[in-house]
């Protein structure tokens, strides 16, 4: 099937963004550990959150999380501290994604977890029990979802949790997001040094909570604004016509183009909000309003973009494609986690961009 996609004459829109998946999935775990009756409002409708909601509803004995990596990690820890014996599995790709680091850490705390298939990979058989351990060490360069999974169950452990992180700590904003949400639900949890987090025992409080809009989803609208100046260039067979031909006809529209993204905040919990600052270097101006953010084009894009993406790995694909479309050379580092996502995102990027001869 083939589609023809045409740019609008001018770019003006007010967009209601989807709710944050990262916040939704954490809020659901915290809500369940609080034995809450008040379901968080404005939950994401993405597959990951739907899978998480179903898994937490009714305590099934067999849980298929499909391709939802976040659900696999968070639920592995959650099931370790809640009553019952459950098998958790996923797609064939999910069964190729390693989980040994998290399982070993949970076992060190006293969890009862068995591998049903290949050692170190899902599926898992988990029997919930009271975890007697309270202190563990973990490499700081592992997936932040492992760290978040452990932190969220920390306050329901009899002695709480003291988590030491060794080496470089990647995706620190996602760890901070987890800690902030835990505090919103009544837990005492914080950094006590640059590499150590403590979580006090005591459990969670059932708390009314509304999920904010998703900064990751916002990145695609930032991308549209960034490439507004080249929208009349034709991309066909990988050959793009000169930007000069469309410069005059698009100059006025580019100047007045405006997108309003509803439900975003300046002081967001989400680490991906940093994307707004990076897009400034690509000519996108962000103005915060009482409804969200307003995007316009302003200034001259950078001639080269060098960025450490270790704290915003989920935005890497957006920036790679944006830079390719804008003919801006770039060098991005800190992308080691992209190879173990639902697919190898680096390989996927290279494969798809080659189709455009990028």
Regions found by a protein language model. Give the residues of each.
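Short, structured segments at the rim of ligand-binding sites
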Residues: 1-358
């Amino acid at each position: 099937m083939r589609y023809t996609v045409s740019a609008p004459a001018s770019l003006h829109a007010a967009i209601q963004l989807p709710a944050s998946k990262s916040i939704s999935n954490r809020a659901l775990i915290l809500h369940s550990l609080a034995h809450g009756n008040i379901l968080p409002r404005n939950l994401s409708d993405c597959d990951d959150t739907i899978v998480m909601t179903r898994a937490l509803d009714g305590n099934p004995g067999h849980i298929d999380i499909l391709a939802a990596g976040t659900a696999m990690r968070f639920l592995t820890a959650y099931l370790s501290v809640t009553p019952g014996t459950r098998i958790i599995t996923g797609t064939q790709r999910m069964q190729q994604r390693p989980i040994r680091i998290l399982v070993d850490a949970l076992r060190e705390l006293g969890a009862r977890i068995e591998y049903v298939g290949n050692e170190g990979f899902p599926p898992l058989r988990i029997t919930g029990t009271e975890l007697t351990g309270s202190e563990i060490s973990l490499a700081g360069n592992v997936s932040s979802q492992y760290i978040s999974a452990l932190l969220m169950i920390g306050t329901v452990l009899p002695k709480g949790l003291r988590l030491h992180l060794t080496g470089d700590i990647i995706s620190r904003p996602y760890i901070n997001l987890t800690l902030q949400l835990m505090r919103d639900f009544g837990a005492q949890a914080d950094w006590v040094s640059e590499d150590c987090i403590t979580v006090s025992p005591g459990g969670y409080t059932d708390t009314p909570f509304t999920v904010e809009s998703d900064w990751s989803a916002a990145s695609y609208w930032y991308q549209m604004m960034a490439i507004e100046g080249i929208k009349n260039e034709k991309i066909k067979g990988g050959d793009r016509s000169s930007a000069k031909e469309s410069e005059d006809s698009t100059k006025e529209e580019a100047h007045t183009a405006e997108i309003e993204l509803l439900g975003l905040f300046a002081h967001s919990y989400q680490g991906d909000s940093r994307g707004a600052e990076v897009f400034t270097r690509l000519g996108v101006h962000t103005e915060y309003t009482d409804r969200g953010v307003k995007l316009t084009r302003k200034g001259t894009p950078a001639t080269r973009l060098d960025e450490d993406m270790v704290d915003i790995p989920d935005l890497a694909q957006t920036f790679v494609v944006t830079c390719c479309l804008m003919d801006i050379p770039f060098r991005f580092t800190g992308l080691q986690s992209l190879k173990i996502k639902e697919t190898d995102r680096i390989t996927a990027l290279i494969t798809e961009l080659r189709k455009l001869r990028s």
